[in-house]
């Protein structure tokens, strides 16, 4: 991957962007685990950048692009995916401009003050992008309440 792709993928995984989320049912593979710690192996999606959640909740371990678990049923993953530029909202695209400017400022202008200026602009654009993105998605209520349940 080139430097641009690395910066874009890094920015896509820094925050749980709503436009970059996916949910997928994982495919059970025919791979037999090496030891008896896990009984099943599932394939992760090819466009996955960062895994958020595996459902149903349970004991699992990631090995490369596979999920090893003792669960043997329908397994779903919530994850951040490698979103094409054409699907980026304007607020994220603008933030990416500043991320690129920050990373390339020194080599283009040979000026540390230029890098500091772009870093400052990036920080502002990043805050605004996260705020805008968060306004588009409802808050998820906490389903598990161990401190309340222990008192019952």
Can you annotate each of these PLM segments?
Residues 1-152:
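Glycine-enriched, solvent-exposed interface loops adjoining structured elements
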């Amino acid at each position: 991957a080139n430097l641009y792709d690395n910066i874009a993928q890094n920015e896509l995984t820094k925050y749980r962007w709503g436009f970059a989320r996916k949910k997928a049912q994982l495919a059970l593979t025919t791979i037999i685990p090496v030891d008896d710690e896990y009984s099943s192996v599932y394939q992760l999606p090819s466009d996955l950048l960062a895994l958020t959640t595996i459902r149903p909740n349970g004991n699992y371990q990631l090995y490369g692009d596979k999920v090893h678990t003792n669960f043997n049923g329908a397994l779903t993953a919530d994850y951040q995916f490698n979103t094409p530029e054409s699907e980026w909202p304007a607020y994220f695209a603008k933030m990416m401009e500043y991320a690129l400017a920050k990373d390339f400022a020194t080599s283009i202008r040979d000026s540390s003050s230029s890098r500091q200026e772009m870093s400052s602009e990036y920080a502002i654009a990043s805050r605004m992008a996260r705020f805008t993105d968060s306004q588009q998605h409802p808050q998820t209520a906490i389903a598990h309440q161990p401190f309340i349940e222990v008192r019952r």
